[in-house]
Regions:
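Short Gly/Thr/Asp-enriched flexible loops that form oxyanion-binding sites at enzyme active sites
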Residues: 64-73
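PRPP-dependent phosphoribosyltransferase catalytic core
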Residues: 6-8, 131-175
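Short glycine-rich phosphate-binding loop at a beta-alpha junction
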Residues: 52-59
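Conserved acidic residues
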Residues: 53, 115, 145
Length: 175
């Protein structure tokens, strides 16, 4: 798939969510079923030779393609949510933000020991959220076999923060 076609459908919103940020909005892709299917097809092609037990999606935009991908691969979808959002027993991981910190959580029974996990989120920036998700997966005994992102902000070098967890990292669009 030509990434330029996808990139044409990423809307840049200046000064959102705060001044100085150029937000990469994926909703134009979501409103185009043909493009959404091409995203899933591209991810499946990348994962073709991998043994996958589950897809982990990070709240909230990681749920969108994560669930579609899990269904296409016929494997479970596992949500990682902001702390306090899951109803059963959870484990929590805190991570740094440019303006403070945040916490994410996963159900303690979500991953079986030894499962091969793909972590998906819509955007890779500094890698903080993906690292926190990785730590949660590992604490439950899962193996991270790949990271998948729709968009990567390469200038922030977040990819380097993920290399301790998996060398298999795919971003469809890089800025």
């Amino acid at each position: 798939m030509k990434t330029s076609l996808l990139a044409e459908h990423i809307r840049e919103v200046k000064d959102f969510p705060k001044e100085g940020i150029s937000f990469k909005d994926i909703t134009p892709i979501l409103s185009n079923p043909e493009l959404s299917n091409k995203v899933i097809d591209s991810f499946i092609e990348f994962l073709n030779d991998k043994d996958i037990d589950a897809i982990v999606g990070v709240e909230s935009r990681g749920f969108l393609f994560g669930m579609l991908l899990a269904n296409a691969l016929k494997v479970p979808f596992i949500p990682i949510r902001k702390a306090g959002k899951l109803p059963a027993d959870t484990i929590v991981e805190e991570y740094a933000l440019e303006y403070g910190s945040a916490k994410v959580e996963i159900h303690t029974d979500a991953i079986q020991e030894g499962w091969n996990i793909v972590i998906h989120d819509d955007l890779l920036a500094t890698g903080g959220t993906a690292v926190a998700a990785s730590k949660l997966v590992q604490r439950l005994g899962g193996n991270i076999i790949s990271f998948l992102f729709l968009v990567e902000l390469s200038f922030l070098e977040g990819r380097t923060n993920l290399l301790d967890y998996s060398l298999s990292i795919k971003s469809l669009i890089k800025y």
